[in-house]
């Protein structure tokens, strides 16, 4: 194992030892008006801390439903972001987050919180600072040159397949994606597949 990959392995182990929470969201889209429609948080042992659909403020576009399968009917009686914001914030402050593509999910958490006037609390302020990006760690581990911070980014399902992590459930659903992220970090902590 190279010195770089040994360091990456140590960082992955630290995330697991620190009992970080692994988080994933599904959303209404990619833009500045997108919001969260599903969120899952699991601990480093895979225990589900929170797994819920989230009722958005506007209809879910067909393009988003085509990716994650979440429909307006499914979220009709789900809690709103305002209902779960406190629980998510509490887990964040207690454990910190590991997210595959942290920039995206933290932006969507902020955008969704802002819709309810919750963007100015300490949670949203510290979100980027205390969220570790599993995608960036994996990109560094693979070491393939790319245009994003010097490394090629890998899709979650591709990274999971490369590391021998099976998909439990449907990819592009928050619980399955959390489990894949945890599996990738666990594989890196053990030295990775390559």
UniProtKB/Swiss-Prot annotation:
Instruction: Give the E.C. number(s).
Output: 3.1.-.-
Mind telling me which Gene3D superfamilies this protein's record contains? Answer: Ribonuclease H-like superfamily/Ribonuclease H (3.30.420.10)
Query: What's a Gene Ontology MF term here?
Result: nucleic acid binding
> What UniProt keywords apply to this chain's record, in alphabetical order?
Exonuclease, Hydrolase, Nuclease
Q: Where is the Exonuclease domain?
A: 20-185
Q: Which InterPro entries does the record cross-reference, listed alphabetically?
A: Exonuclease_RNaseT/DNA_pol3, RNaseH-like_sf, RNaseH_sf
What's the protein called, per UniProt?
Answer: Uncharacterized exonuclease CP81
Could you tell me which species this protein originates from? Escherichia phage 186 (Bacteriophage 186)
